[in-house]
Amino acid sequence: MSRLQTRFAQLKQENRAALVTFVTAGDPDYASSLEILKGLPAAGADVIELGMPFTDPMADGPAIQLANIRALDGGQTLARTLQMVREFRSGDSETPLVLMGYFNPIHHYGVERFIAEAKEVGVDGLIVVDLPPEHNEDLCHPAQAAGIDFIRLTTPTTGDQRLPTVLEGSSGFVYYVSVAGVTGANAATLEHVEEAVARLRRHTDLPIGIGFGIRSAEHAAAVARLADGVVVGSALIDRIAKARDNAQAVKDVLALCGELAEGVRNAR
């Protein structure tokens, strides 16, 4: 079993959802970002999504757009992001780590080279937000052939006719974007989330993670009662933006992760 399969199976036995945390590689700088990354599992993160900085993150709201700018201004590249995963893996062989971002940097890096290096450093999955199922041959199938999960996004506007196409070839888990729009937007109602999870379960046996708009331990707990995973990104990245310095940013992100983890663990 893959690290993602193992983690979700373990949490199912514990009857709780996974806390999935998103941070951008290189934000606020390389050293602080690596410190955050290494600290997240102990703070309660069950799965980590690591953003690959890009100049035009069109699906992301202001918080993550600014995180991309901070990281790129600090010299973060795709090669340095893969190096960061390697350094993380040297001390953690169990926590699943998923790279999330856009196809353009991967295309410029070289798809074959990227997949080979991602596999070597210990990447477990990919979320590439601007690569629809019609382009599975470009990255999804080669990644899966190398043993890297390809995680699909579904949204409130993904209809029942489209869902099987989106889910075909998906692996690891399904990421349900609970608000149609950019990351960090207002949260969806719990009733809406419950209906969406039920609809997705009719189409897939994969674990379902819910993201976009989750900002507090209480909200994370409420979503954790409905889904297999609770994804939090913008709320963590806001802590970096508001911190007085990078050392404070590390502390604040890990503190919020701890609060969210407590909410998720006490949800059921």
Swiss-Prot record:
GO terms for biological process: L-tryptophan biosynthetic process. InterPro entries: Aldolase_TIM, RibuloseP-bd_barrel, Trp_synthase_alpha_AS, Trp_synthase_suA. Its EC number is 4.2.1.20. One of its GO terms (molecular function) is tryptophan synthase activity. CDD domains: Tryptophan_synthase_alpha. It catalyses: (1S,2R)-1-C-(indol-3-yl)glycerol 3-phosphate + L-serine = D-glyceraldehyde 3-phosphate + L-tryptophan + H2O. The alpha subunit is responsible for the aldol cleavage of indoleglycerol phosphate to indole and glyceraldehyde 3-phosphate. PROSITE patterns: TRP_SYNTHASE_ALPHA (PS00167). This is Tryptophan synthase alpha chain. Belongs to the TrpA family. The active site is at residues 49, 60. Keywords: Amino-acid biosynthesis, Aromatic amino acid biosynthesis, Lyase, Tryptophan biosynthesis. Pathway: Amino-acid biosynthesis; L-tryptophan biosynthesis; L-tryptophan from chorismate: step 5/5. It holds the Pfam family Trp_syntA. Tetramer of two alpha and two beta chains. HAMAP family: Trp_synth_alpha (MF_00131). It is an enzyme of class 4 (lyase). The keyword Amino-acid biosynthesis applies. GO terms for cellular component: cytosol. The gene is trpA. The keyword Lyase applies.
